Amino acid sequence: MRKMLSFMMTSADGYHADPGDALDWHNVDQEFSQFALAQLREAGTLVFGRVTYEGMAAFWPTPAGQQSDPDVAKAMNTTPKIVISRTLAQATWVGTQVISTGAEQELAKLKQQPGKDIVIPGSSTLTASLLPTGLLDELRIMVNPVILGQGRSLFAGADMTSLKLLKTQQFTSGNVLLYYQPITN
């Protein structure tokens, strides 16, 4: 059975985007890029919510995305992708399948297939909706050393979920990566 994990960036006060949905406060450097590439290499499938998908699809296939980090761009562009959306009719990013209904069942089937991990990069709304299903095996939350004061809460609308800390990883940038296992009842 494949493992499904979600990776998200957050501010120290729990926001994943500022009030204008900007992400320029993300504390990324060469060490982060190496981590991101290693995580992508663990992935057999990437799963996105619509908003995150649209942002990624507008960047990684472009010359700017490929120049920013060629190895990460290659991994993002060649790994099979799924976007969960009730409103997106068609995906433009090569290698992307749209699931508009029955997402929980489709993801459960995908987990049963052999292969590498299923990784959800970003997509906080999707992650929050999957927490009560028991499909998520791991949450990887990277806390950036910044306080936004306001913005979009990392787990807005999520039901209370207990987490078991698996490990932590400190980055020289000041980021701290928390590895959690959701505890489902």
Please name every model-derived segment.
Residues 1-185:
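Enzymes that bind and transform nitrogen-containing heteroaromatic metabolites
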